[in-house]
Amino acid sequence: MRNNGIGVLAGSPEKARKSGKTLVAVTGGIGSGKSTAIGILSSFGYPVFGADETYRELLTDDGFVSLVSGKVGVKPIERDGKLFLDRKAIAELVFYDEKAKKKLESVTHPAIMEKMLQNASAAKGDLVFCEVPLLYEGGYRDLFDFVFIVKRPDRARFAAVVSRDGRTEEQAREIASRQFDYSAYDGDDRTIVVENDGDIPQLSERLKEGIERIKKEK
């Protein structure tokens, strides 16, 4: 991976479209069930790429680690000749400092998107799904042919965040308040709302319905 120009989306969406691929972003608020949806789509046999796994891939690149550490002013950890982000220190910093959070995101979000789209371009199959938590906040909507918005009742999604991340409900609500408001947003005619208000089999059926709609419209 390049260690410079990380903020540039290097033509990967165009490459994917030219090769006949249909790119679908899977998004939604915190705790909505995006990762669960991605797991189900993978079980259907479709190529899927997540922001978290892409970020972990980037963390193996010393140049990326140095760039991020320098951007937020947190010294990287060096171990056995490799550089590692001090993720705990950075997490504590950006949770309380909105300016530091924006600095971090100005580096990490474009890099994650570029790497994810490169991976999607190289994937087998003509229908590829990418989990993009900050699709609208980051201005990435136009990079995808279709969007799945996963929606879940607030009580259930905040409970999921408390259980998953060890945060309080108040912290979960605070994070949600900073994100795009999906509650009354259904998107454009190539946006499919997937209601996650039941069990896994119900979510699976709704995802199948969304896929059938994509196949008809693409």
Label each residue range with its predicted role:
Residues 46-61:
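Short beta-strand-centered segment that lines the nucleotide-binding/catalytic pocket of NTP-utilizing
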Residues 115, 142-143, 163-217:
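Small-molecule kinase domains that catalyze NTP-dependent phosphoryl transfer to phosphate-bearing small molecules
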